[in-house]
Amino acid sequence: VSTRPIADAGDLLRRIPRDSPVAWVRNGDGIVGWGVAARLEVRGRERFSRTQRWWNQLCASAVIDDTVSVPGTGAIAFGSFAFDPERDMSVVIVPKVVIGRRGGQSWITTIGLGTADPAELSPVNALPKAPTSVTWSRGSRERA
């Protein structure tokens, strides 16, 4: 895992990949990742503890070289956890590349073997189109 400063991450929203977006962006700061260095799919009541063990093992075996050292740099994962522990799958993705910005400081993190040239990493995409309409409908709930 290698994190290095870069001159400017640009518009992070335009860096979000179209095919497998993982991002956390707020008010221009945040992180955008692409590629998959590691992935975990887990379900069940122990999904959080199993994920924690997996992440701890991953970090323990990683060589981390982070010259930026702000929240969002170094080893990082994006997770989506199911509300129903038995029914739906939870997924955690460790991206191959992350570009981020926090408080005016920008960086690139590469996870895996080798390093990446920031100029070749992610094409700048058009911003996603805003929804043109919203449809409301009644929901349903099953008894737990």
Language-model features: where?
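Signature of the chorismate-utilizing enzyme
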Residues: V1-A144
